[in-house]
């Protein structure tokens, strides 16, 4: 905390761009150094600092894939998903928005045939949708039991997310491209985020 206070002293609010990347890089280096000095794995040190000292040995991970590779087609996509399952993943995330809505729905349905119907598929638009497109996708995605609908629009477009939450009742994930506490706080306050 002291290092953050020093690095952010006299800084204006916000956290975009080079400053947040530089501070984040220094922050990671400091944690790595402290871990080495303490002769403890970083996960243990963080658990002691911010938890009860007993790190959770089970960490949720998912496989991210389902990109729009040239010549892949539906068979290639389902083969890719099967490989993730063979590696032990139970949840898979695939991209959407790189094809038409109808084509994306075909791809989703093909993946769901491999994964099964029980919320094991997340989809990620990488922030590319305007409000109308995000809602059009939401209406169609509501037909599937998805793990989440990720980054439908720009994460700083709080109005888009707030309105979208009125049209999509499943879990919505966003915020990985926010770089400040203020942005994360405003996302929670103004973007219609729900606890799910």
Report residues per predicted region.
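Metal- or metallocofactor-binding catalytic centers and their adjacent structured scaffolds
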Residues: 1-37
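Tryptophan-centric aromatic hotspots in well-structured domains and transmembrane helices
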Residues: 31, 61-68, 89, 148
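Catalytic domains of carbohydrate-active enzymes, especially glycoside hydrolases
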Residues: 80-95
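Residues within well-ordered alpha helices
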Residues: 32-36, 83, 140
């Amino acid at each position: 905390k002291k290092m953050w206070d020093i690095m952010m002293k006299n800084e204006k609010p916000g956290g975009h761009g080079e400053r947040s990347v530089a501070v984040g890089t220094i922050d990671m280096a400091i944690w790595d150094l402290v871990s080495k000095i303490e002769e403890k794995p970083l996960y243990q040190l963080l658990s002691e600092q911010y938890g009860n000292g007993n790190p959770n040995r089970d960490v949720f991970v998912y496989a991210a894939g389902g990109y729009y590779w040239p010549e892949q087609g539906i068979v290639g996509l389902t083969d890719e998903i099967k490989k993730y399952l063979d590696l032990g993943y139970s949840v898979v995330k695939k991209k959407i928005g790189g094809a038409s809505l109808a084509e994306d729905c075909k791809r989703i349905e093909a993946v769901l045939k491999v994964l099964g119907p029980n919320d094991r598929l997340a989809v990620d638009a990488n922030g590319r949708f305007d409000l109308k497109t995000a809602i059009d996708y939401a209406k169609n995605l509501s037909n599937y039991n998805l793990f989440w609908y990720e980054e439908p629009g720009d994460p700083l477009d709080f109005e888009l997310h707030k309105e979208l939450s009125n049209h999509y009742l499943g879990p919505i994930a966003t915020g990985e491209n926010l770089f400040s506490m203020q942005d994360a706080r405003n996302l929670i306050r103004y973007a219609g985020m729900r606890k799910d």
